[in-house]
């Protein structure tokens, strides 16, 4: 790897708050906005890229809607489409599904797994949810209160992972114990 010393479009952040879209822009224009900031002006190319990104998150038919017309899960998928449009090497996700209802969260977890497999992009996913970590992660780090790494464990359970998957219970117990230990 190489040392990261400044921001770059090869690393994109998706935040927990799903109200990160510009309310006066349509879904399509929200996805295109970072591309325009990078200097892309060709309207045909902008449309091609935004359509492809929205297709990946199953929102192409919603491209003319405004953020106030979207559910929380749809807003989060638009944020992911914005990230994908820039073709990053790494997507950093800070508890992106934490404030969503259980059904939407499960759906977006499935969609994230499909995107990860299709796009071959590295996703660094921050969560306090053990189930989410075990189901989504290929490598799971547990942070200590002081900011260090308490555990670093490869997740060898074959994807897709469900609570019924062999090894899920043992892994869940291991992380639950680690989270409740001091230090």
Protein language model regions, located:
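ABC ATPase NBD coupling module
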Residues: 1-17, 24-25, 37, 163-168
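Short helical segment in ABC ATPase nucleotide-binding domains corresponding to the A-loop/adjacent helical element
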Residues: 28-36, 47, 51, 154
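Conserved ABC ATPase "signature" region
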Residues: 43-62, 114
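Conserved signature/switch motifs of ABC ATPase nucleotide-binding domains
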Residues: 65-68, 86
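Hydrophobic anchor residue at the start of the ABC signature
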Residues: 80
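Catalytic Walker B motif of ABC-type/P-loop ATPase nucleotide-binding domains
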Residues: 91-94
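Conserved H-loop
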Residues: 120-126
């Amino acid at each position: 790897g190489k040392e990261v010393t400044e921001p770059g479009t090869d690393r994109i952040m998706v935040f927990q708050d799903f109200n990160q879209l510009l309310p006066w822009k349509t879904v399509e224009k929200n996805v295109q906005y970072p591309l325009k900031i990078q200097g892309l002006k060709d309207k045909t190319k902008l449309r091609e890229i935004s359509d492809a990104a929205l297709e990946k998150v199953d929102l192409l038919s919603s491209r003319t809607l405004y953020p106030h017309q979207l559910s929380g899960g749809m807003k989060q998928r638009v944020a992911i489409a914005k990230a994908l449009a820039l073709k990053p090497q790494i997507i950093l996700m800070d508890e992106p599904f934490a404030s969503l209802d259980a059904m939407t969260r499960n759906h977006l977890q499935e969609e994230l797994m499909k995107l990860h497999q299709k796009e071959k992009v590295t996703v660094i996913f921050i969560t306090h949810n053990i189930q989410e970590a075990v189901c989504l992660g290929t490598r799971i780090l547990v942070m200590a209160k002081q900011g260090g790494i308490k555990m670093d464990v490869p997740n060898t359970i074959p994807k897709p992972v469900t609570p019924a998957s062999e090894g899920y219970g043992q892994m869940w117990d291991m992380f639950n114990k680690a989270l409740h230990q001091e230090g």
